[in-house]
């Protein structure tokens, strides 16, 4: 009986102390989330949500993505690229103040979130070009 009681106390203590997170780990997680968000977001100087959504869709298609869903009211576009592996991206467009649109892209390769800044940079470079050409009415 005493052996079981001791074993339960030891297991309970191990579980309790094993779940405690340090302040450093919490801060590290928050910092990496902020850093990841900086890769994933860009603000554009336009108040036209529909045109921004059209540019996002055109950019994804130019990058060989196949559209899964697009919802103007929600400001969400989902697309998939199949080239040896599955890359899924979800882009949200929302107003930022009265004169800007905030575009955020989230990508997943297979089941893992893409944390490398390069794919996001490539997407936003292509989107910036598309937005520029659209603003200057160049086809």
Segments predicted by a language model, with ranges:
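Bacterial N-terminal signal peptides that target proteins for export
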Residues: 1-9
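C-terminal motif of bacterial Sec signal peptides marking the signal peptidase cleavage site
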Residues: 15-18
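Ser/Thr-rich, low-complexity intrinsically disordered terminal regions
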Residues: 20-139
């Amino acid at each position: 009986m005493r052996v079981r009681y001791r074993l339960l106390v030891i297991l309970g203590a191990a579980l309790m102390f094993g779940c405690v997170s340090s302040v450093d780990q919490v801060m590290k997680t928050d910092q990496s989330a902020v850093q990841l968000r900086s890769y994933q977001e860009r603000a554009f100087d336009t108040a036209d949500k529909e045109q921004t959504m059209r540019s996002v869709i055109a950019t994804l298609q130019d990058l060989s993505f196949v559209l899964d869903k697009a919802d103007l009211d929600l400001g969400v576009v989902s697309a998939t690229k199949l080239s040896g592996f599955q890359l899924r991206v979800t882009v949200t467009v929302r107003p930022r103040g009265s004169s800007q649109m905030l575009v955020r892209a989230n990508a997943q390769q297979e089941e893992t979130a893409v944390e490398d800044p390069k794919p996001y940079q490539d997407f936003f470079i292509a989107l910036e070009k598309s937005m520029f050409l659209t603003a200057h009415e160049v086809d």
